A protein has these predicted regions:
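Signature of multi-pass transmembrane helix bundles
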Residues: 1-53, 159-292, 311, 384-409
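Short glycine/serine/threonine-biased micro-segments
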Residues: 11, 58, 67, 107, ...
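Membrane-embedded alpha-helical segments and adjacent helix-loop junctions characteristic
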Residues: 30-127, 256-345
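Hydrophobic alpha-helical segments, principally membrane-spanning helices and signal/leader peptides
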Residues: 38, 45, 94-96, 131-139, ...
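Generic signal for short, ordered secondary-structure residues
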Residues: 100, 104, 139, 230-233, ...
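C-terminal transmembrane helix pair
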Residues: 113-114, 121-162, 166-196, 322-409
Length: 409
């Protein structure tokens, strides 16, 4: 799947460039594509520099958590649930605790913590994988849920809106929560269908129903807060949770006689080893994405959608937000640039800008996630992971558009 996808990016880019050259007379398109290849190669190295530090830091703290028994405790608590969703993962396996920590970090918007924990989890799952290069069912479910954008506190979206002068930066908070719920639910159900998981098992429902009620109560509580209070809570909760997690690892580790410094250094060394293996996969995927963007293929797609919507007689206001949706699976920085451009062009509280902000907060950089997570363990055949992840992405986009029409007309 990844092989065909990667090759397809280059073929589509080449066809698009030829059309622009032969029909539109744009001879500079090839220079732009070549420039993009080298720019993406440079960007890959810059991303790796950041990942080296982040992975080294968090895998160090995670080693303390492992030796303190925190990960093992989480694995025991959630063992019955994962036994049904990931049957190939034995009860009490460390991967269960790591997956739980990863989902919690993602939900709170702690990306710097979530990625290293996620890479540790995918490596733990790889130990159970009978194949060195083919993704297992458990790895696919984990990756698709990661790619579905598990977000409860989209602090960065609030920041972008505040920077552009929005009087109420948190206006899109509830729309983002609803849209990201759509993407996560669809991603989960898609994988459940492909893998024939027993979603209606009483044990699964015993975990999911209280979790859904707790989430609903949390959302209802947040909905009663003012914009100022909500923004303040988002910032405080994220930072306090992050530092509190570090202190929890250290205190429990010290109480259980773990040599925390030595454990940290031991884990940090592993982080360095994980990071250096990612570079070839990042270069491959980011260069292909860069060529596709520079070729103008995404612009062709956007124009086609606009004409189709007009032909159907539907409202076209949301179309101006689609550049963010079209590039988000490929590049988070490009989607961020598209969002800011939409805010500046249409106005920060215009309908297209609100839709774009909701899309940005409820979708994920699917191909980056694929490259990083599967690249870390050498997976080359993703099976149904790409299809399910993109379906979740589509659900997030459609959910964002629908919710914004509901909230903002």
């Amino acid at each position: 799947m990844l092989n065909g996808l990667w090759l397809g990016f280059f073929i589509v880019a080449a066809v698009s460039a030829l059309v622009q050259w032969l029909v539109g007379g744009n001879a500079g398109i090839f220079a732009a594509m070549v420039e993009s290849i080298f720019a993406m190669a440079k960007l890959s190295v810059e991303v790796m520099v950041l990942l080296f530090g982040t992975l080294t830091l968090w895998l160090g703290f995670l080693r303390i958590a492992e030796k303190a028994g925190i990960v093992e405790w989480l694995a025991k608590v959630l063992g019955p649930l994962f036994l049904r969703l990931m049957p190939e993962v034995p009860p009490g396996h460390p991967a269960i605790g790591l997956i739980t920590l990863n989902f919690a970090a993602n939900g709170l918007g702690l990306d710097n913590a979530a990625t290293p924990i996620g890479l540790k989890a995918i490596k733990a799952l790889q130990e159970l994988n009978p194949s060195d290069t083919i993704a297992s069912n458990a790895q696919i479910l984990f990756l698709v849920l990661n790619a579905s954008s598990l977000t409860l506190l989209p602090v960065t979206i609030f920041m972008y809106r505040a920077q552009q002068g929005a009087p109420d930066p948190t206006l899109v908070f509830l729309p983002i929560l609803l849209a990201t719920s759509c993407s996560t639910i669809v991603g989960f159900l898609a994988v459940a269908f492909m893998q024939r998981l027993r979603v209606w098992d009483p044990v699964v429902l015993a975990y999911l129903i209280p979790g859904a009620l707790l989430l609903g109560g949390f959302m209802a509580l947040l909905g009663t807060l003012s914009a100022t209070a909500l923004a303040g809570l988002s910032s405080i909760l994220g930072n306090v949770t992050l530092f509190g997690l570090i202190m929890l690892f250290l205190i429990i580790g010290a109480m259980r006689k773990v040599k925390v410094y030595e454990a940290f250094v031991e884990g940090a060394k592993e982080g360095f080893d994980v990071a250096k293996n990612l570079l070839p996969y990042l270069v491959a995927m980011l260069c292909a994405v860069g060529v596709l963007r520079a070729s103008g293929a995404l612009d062709f797609g956007l124009d086609g959608i606009r004409h189709l919507v007009e032909w159907a007689g539907w409202d076209t206001r949301f179309v101006d937000a689609l550049p963010t949706a079209m590039v988000k699976p490929f590049s988070g920085s490009a989607a961020r640039a598209m969002l800011i451009e939409t805010m500046k062009t249409s106005g920060v509280d215009s309908f297209p800008a609100l839709v774009a902000a909701t899309i940005q907060g409820s979708t994920e950089t699917t191909f980056y996630v694929l490259a990083v997570y599967f690249g870390a363990v050498g997976i080359q055949r993703a099976r149904h992971a790409v299809g399910c992840a993109l379906l979740a992405e589509l659900a997030g986009v459609l959910g964002a558009i629908g919710v914004c029409y509901w909230f903002f007309g």
